[in-house]
């Protein structure tokens, strides 16, 4: 049984450990873009065990974060309590999440490449809809190079990112940073080793 055949069961099993499988520190690309965060609020999309949502709260933002795994949300709540941060956690998949139109000043999606192309287009549209004009969008994902490294991600070509995809999906944004690169990452036990990466930071017009 693969993660794509039974995703909720797969992820609940992966998160059923006291260990934070993606670590407790924020994603390195997200951290590098801190200067571009807008004051106010943030939405962390498919935030897993909460490392990025908690870090966003530590930057003084009012944070909503969701993930469909109950085990992940429980661990995220514990992480926030330990770091003395307030985050509004929602146990929900992206289709059922209560997306609020033009609500957030920042929307962040880190390694959420479970979505096939048609589903991804709809998810990107929801992220765009929820971001205020002038707000910041930050995305980190894997490129086709990741298929040879096999150090994380879905391992499916159709799920990989590239720069033309991002420029087309967010054509109404001003691109602040868009790069594809290879780097050594060390995010818990699940993301470790040389990786093919894409980072996008953009401002909604």
Please place each PLM-identified region on the residue numbering.
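Conserved SAM/SAH-binding beta-strand->alpha-helix loop
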Residues: 69-71
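Conserved SAM-binding strand-loop segment of SAM-dependent methyltransferases
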Residues: 83-96
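A short acidic, Gly/Pro-enriched loop at the edge of an enzyme's catalytic core
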Residues: 95-106
